[in-house]
Amino acid sequence: MAKKQYTIINSSSTLDTYTEYDLIESPAIVSLKNVENKGLICVGSWVEYRTVDNSGNEITCISVQDANTGDVFSGQSATFRESFSDVVDRISDMEETPDMFFIEVLHRTSKSGRDYLICALVSPDRALARMGYTEKNIPMPEPQK
């Protein structure tokens, strides 16, 4: 099988071969559309990249790896990419930039009836409480290597 052709636009860090494969080429990648509304992802690694779809059209995609499970979620939704970029900018402005952060995937419907995706930053305390942890100061998972 030929290597998928793509150009990385932006990423969480310099990606090693395994992480790049997981985020862009792996057949185990799940569509962001399949994440339930308000589903939490503990973002570890992520990448935004350009590739070509089956029709030969250039598309921009984003892939996010859950640091807890290693699962990768990917999609080409412009609204999701824009909201994710806003979250990354917000995280980058923090005094202590975390290696990981929580987002929730939100399914919305436009006034014209079209479905679209966005994401929102979730505080670690709120995310952990939603995951069933009641104690404070629960350590974040180690980043996936």
What role is predicted for each listed range?
Residues 1-69, 112, 124-126:
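OB-fold ssDNA-binding interfaces and closely related basic DNA-contact patches used
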Residues 40-43, 62-64, 98-105, 118-121:
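Hydrophobic beta-strand residues in large extracellular and virion-surface proteins
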Residues 77-82, 135-137:
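A short, sequence-level motif marking secondary-structure junctions
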Residues 82-103:
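Short nucleic-acid-contacting surface segments enriched for D/E, G, S/T with interspersed K/R
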Residues 104-143:
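OB-fold/S1-family single-stranded nucleic acid-binding modules
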